[in-house]
Design a protein with these regions (language model features):
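Non-catalytic, conserved peripheral segments adjacent to functional cores
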Residues: 1-94, 117, 126-174
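Conserved metal-binding segment of the jelly-roll/cupin
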Residues: 94-117
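Compact nucleic-acid interaction/catalytic patches
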Residues: 120
Length: 174
């Protein structure tokens, strides 16, 4: 069984700017050695922007490797696989440009930006499928909700994320 984890993803800089390699073949760590099929970029101009919690259902479940290109986030990863003994457990990671987080299949992923103009790049091992995508309301997950309330009363959310289902309702469907 796989679990989420944070790893170094170094950015190198000099007077010309920065360079950050993102190898598609990550043999240096077998946990990262996936068949990545798509690379996505997310740009959040506003601080306290919330994305997620998102996941996809079979047969389009996704493992994700998320790297912050610029800015800083707190990432929330929650096991939504009822067959996993980690079911319902939430992990929280502070992620900046020198780190990345591996999110295995069977986990929902959400984040809050802690700086304006945050750019995130993420690799996925299955293509995006709107018909299989699920969005869970962040405030229905106690750790995520408490964290957000410590920083802001007015986070920025998309309509889709604002209309996400509740964690308690999801558990009843299993």
């Amino acid at each position: 069984m796989e679990f989420p984890f944070i790893t170094e993803h170094k950015t190198f800089g000099d007077d010309r700017g920065n360079f950050s390699p993102s190898p598609l073949y990550m043999k240096h760590d077998q946990r990262l050695d996936k068949h990545w099929v798509q690379v996505n970029t997310s740009i959040s101009p506003l601080i306290y922007t919330i994305r997620g919690l998102h996941f996809q259902l079979e047969p389009f479940e996704q493992a994700k490797y998320l790297k912050v290109v610029s800015g800083k986030i707190f990432q929330f990863v929650m096991c939504v696989d009822k067959t996993h003994f980690d079911f319902g457990k939430t992990y929280v990671f502070e992620v900046d440009k020198d780190h990345a987080v591996m999110v295995p299949r069977g986990y929902a992923n959400g984040l809050i930006t802690m700086e304006p103009n945050t750019v995130i790049q993420y690799f996925v091992d299955s293509p995006y499928s709107p018909q299989h995508e699920k969005s869970m309301l962040y405030s229905s997950v106690e750790e995520f909700d408490t964290f957000v309330k410590n920083y802001t009363e007015n986070p920025h959310l998309s309509e889709k994320d604002r209309d996400g289902f509740l964690w308690e309702d999801y558990k009843k469907t299993l």
